[in-house]
Amino acid sequence: MNKFFLEIITPEKTFYRGDVESIQIPAVGGDCMIMAGHQPMVFATQPGMIAITADGQRREAFMSEGFIEVRPDATIAFSQAVEWPEDIDERRAEEAKERAEEMVRRNRSAAEYQLNRLALQRAFARLRVKPRGNKE
């Protein structure tokens, strides 16, 4: 299978850097599968699960909001946070979900509602990814 270079960057670190066969990304309009030779494009991502396939092994992780640029020579994703399932603090994610649910209920404006809804999406996505782990 053809490979392409993938780099996933957060404000704190380079989460992933290497050649892959594919990556599935939670795009704002729905999941997007990127493979070698994909048409160049830029799109926004939303909180959810990513799946990276490298050397025939599929590995899943949580990805927060951000954007991705697909170029002929590389694909680069920028995200606020990306975590492997084993690095997700389930208790912290559950607490964040409860706080976000409360804030959504008490929202004061459309802007607050959108921010709180995004926080809730992040918490739900982390909790969905945590028990899944790796698929081999």
Briefly describe each language-model feature range.
Residues 1-5, 132:
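N-terminal export/targeting signal detector
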